[in-house]
Amino acid sequence: MHQINRKIQNKIDNIKYLQNELMNFKNFSEDEISNLLQKFEKTPRDEVSFYFKALFTNLEFANVLLEIADKYKENKKIQINILSSIGNMIRRYGLEETDEIYDYFKTNMFIKNVGVYVAIHLPYLKRFEKENFWEYFMKIKDMTPKKMAETTFLNIVNEHITEIPNEHKGEVIAFLKQKQQNSNNEGGQKYYQELIYTILRGE
């Protein structure tokens, strides 16, 4: 039988411990739950390993996270950590994307200081409404925190640069020109200029 190395085993034990504590969240205060979630959120973002797959695709646990999110709707720190946890569990480990999970992401799309964490993962969910694709994308750059919102929007522009609808190209180019002007190094300025050229060439 293959021996799991100690480093991996320690991570497995930590994930199991945090999941077990969160499964029994009713025994803890709001602050204690928030602290547990802050620790757990780091685990699906950590280096991917086959050994973690069964833990991160546990739908029963994901549903408990949704239950916690519903109970503490006004706690943005809790919402952010749950959105990040579930998003990474889906994208990195293949957690089943249920209607309840998708609806939870949609509910938080435009919540101040929370919506940007939705934007990191929502475009990659299977149920993402393609007809509102670019209408939603164009709103991401104006979310808060500003730096994270602009980085997320820039990543999306990069991934879909040949698909930008004509009606949005002017606004995207204006955003890129502003980023270019604010860039304090030649490499950054060249990067934004190349993106602009790519968009213009597609017209």
Task: Say what each PLM segment does.
Residues 6-10, 22-81, 85-98:
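Alpha-helical solenoid scaffolds in large eukaryotic transport, assembly, and signaling factors
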Residues 83, 87-92, 101-145:
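Alpha-helical adaptor scaffolds
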Residues 119-120, 125-203:
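Extended alpha-helical scaffolding segments
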Residues 17-30, 65-76, 104-119, 139-148, ...:
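Helix-loop junctions that connect tandem helical modules in alpha-solenoid scaffolds
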Residues 1-23, 181-186, 200-203:
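Short, Lys/Arg-enriched, disordered terminal segments
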Residues 2, 12-16, 45-49, 63, ...:
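Extended alpha-solenoid scaffolds built from HEAT/ARM-like alpha-helical repeats
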Residues 15-19, 49-69, 92-106, 128-139, ...:
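Amphipathic alpha-helical scaffolding segments comprising HEAT/armadillo-like alpha-solenoid repeats
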Residues 31-51, 77-90, 113-126, 149-162, ...:
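Amphipathic alpha-helical elements of HEAT/ARM-like alpha-solenoid repeat scaffolds that form extended
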